[in-house]
Amino acid sequence: MGEFRTSYVIDPPNGQIPRLAEPLYDLERKNFRYRYLTGIGDNSGPEALPLAERCLIGFGNTAGPGMMGTLYNSTYQFIQTPDHVAIIVEMAHDARIIPTYASAEEARANRRPDVLEQWFGDSVGWYEGDTLVVETVNIKPLQMQQRSVPISPSGKIT
């Protein structure tokens, strides 16, 4: 059985994300100024719209990595084959297809090249007893810009 936590953050151990070198509101202000000066903004084309509004991925990190429920459409369907686990998310019909291996070492050795950035990152899985462990790296930077839980480009979620 797991442990009760007050935070999704496990590193640092106190569960508190360190302060940003530059406060987020300053970054948002700079982003607004850039939009104002260049004309590139919410009305300039679909690329400027949020990913969920473009139906590329669901909002609220429903499909992960770090799968978080939202107020509605939080149903997940798990499909398991001998060498894959698929997690189908009701919100925006996102799907995570996770290859599974005999061990963590084998899983990590079979990762996709970093140049292949995918929505929801590169996930591999293995079983420890009857527990499925999923490790995700190489999360698409564009997806990271709109996350509620910040993750660095070199971050890893297990």
Question: What is each stretch, according to the model?
Answer:
Residues 1-158:
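PEST-like low-complexity, intrinsically disordered acidic/proline/serine-rich tracts
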